[in-house]
Curated annotation (Swiss-Prot):
GO terms for biological process: electron transport chain. Residues 5-96 form the 2Fe-2S ferredoxin-type domain. PROSITE patterns: 2FE2S_FER_1, 2FE2S_FER_2. InterPro entries: 2Fe-2S_ferredoxin-like_sf, 2Fe-2S_ferredoxin-type, 2Fe2S_fd_BS, Beta-grasp_dom_sf, Fd_pln. One of its GO terms (molecular function) is metal ion binding. It comes from Desmonostoc muscorum (Nostoc muscorum). This is Ferredoxin-1. The lineage of its organism: Bacteria, Bacillati, Cyanobacteriota, Cyanophyceae, Nostocales. Keywords: 2Fe-2S, Electron transport, Iron, Iron-sulfur, Metal-binding, Transport. Belongs to the 2Fe2S plant-type ferredoxin family. Its cofactor is [2Fe-2S] cluster. Binds 1 [2Fe-2S] cluster. [2Fe-2S] cluster binds at residues 42, 47, 50, 80. It comes from the Bacteria. Ferredoxins are iron-sulfur proteins that transfer electrons in a wide variety of metabolic reactions.
């Protein structure tokens, strides 16, 4: 049985929305199921459209192939291929901050 974590998403206006995300589901998929409108493109971890930045907590994004080690160390995450591994808070809409 999957462990369910509380994932708080902070949009560009600072509005916080907390959703329950099982550890075997991608954050983006569950956010969409909850009616949230987050940016995405490839859904495969190969671009940066869905990028967010982790404020607190941890994820498993081993399926991603776009971010480099430096970006990951700074807390960037691709929500389309990120599984929560703890309760966490993510600032969404961070693609432009990567460059």
């Amino acid at each position: 049985m999957a462990t369910v974590y509380k994932v708080t998403l902070v949009d560009q206006e600072g509005t916080e929305t907390t959703i329950d995300v099982p550890d075997d589901e991608y954050i983006l998929d569950i956010a969409e199921d909850q009616g949230l409108d987050l940016p995405y493109s490839c859904r495969a971890g190969a671009c940066s459209t869905c990028a967010g930045k982790i404020v607190s907590g941890t994820v498993d994004q081993s399926d991603q192939s776009f971010l480099d080690d430096d970006q990951i160390e700074k807390g960037y995450v691709l929500t389309c291929v990120a599984y929560p591994t703890s309760d966490l808070k993510i600032e969404t809409h961070k693609e432009e901050d990567l460059y």
